[in-house]
């Protein structure tokens, strides 16, 4: 597993992970942790290039910073992306992703997003405690959609005020 940092102005940390054994090619962006650890979902898409994925992960991480601040969650903003075909998933891929998340030492907490479900996150959790939105049976908050919706409503109210 090779993890390397990518310098991006205005971001606390952006990193790339390539793990040939599992086929993982992923990016994590932490925009700001002033208010707390960076929270942001993990998505998996067949990006055309790493540059496209980098644009997406940084844009989304920055958005999470503002959404978290407006909703007064006590969290910062981050995001992760896996570059790949979401129809091709494996335990090894998600275990490697869990190790990548763990390498941030709690600075980034992941959750589900596009093409990532609770079963995928349960595998990630085998390698890191820094994952949320897991099943209620595992002692977590369950489906994060209500919290996402709440954040959107609070953001809209703040924009109107």
Language model features with spans:
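N-terminal ligand-binding/catalytic initiation module
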Residues: 1-142
């Amino acid at each position: 597993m090779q993890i390397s940092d990518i310098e991006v102005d205005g971001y606390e940390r952006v990193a790339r992970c390539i793990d040939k054994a599992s086929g993982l090619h992923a990016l994590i962006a932490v925009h700001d942790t002033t208010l707390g650890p960076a929270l942001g979902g993990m998505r998996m898409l067949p990006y055309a290039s790493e540059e496209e994925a980098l644009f997406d992960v940084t844009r989304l991480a920055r958005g999470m910073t503002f959404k978290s601040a407006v909703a007064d969650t006590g969290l910062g903003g981050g995001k992760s992306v896996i570059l790949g075909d979401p129809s091709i998933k494996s335990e090894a891929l998600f275990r490697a992703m869990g190790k990548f998340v763990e390498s941030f030492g709690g600075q980034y907490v992941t959750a589900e997003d596009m093409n990532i479900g609770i079963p995928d996150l349960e595998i990630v959790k085998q390698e890191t405690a820094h994952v949320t939105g897991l099943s209620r049976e595992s002692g977590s908050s369950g489906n994060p959609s209500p919290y996402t919706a709440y954040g959107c409503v609070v953001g809209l109210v703040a924009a109107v005020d």
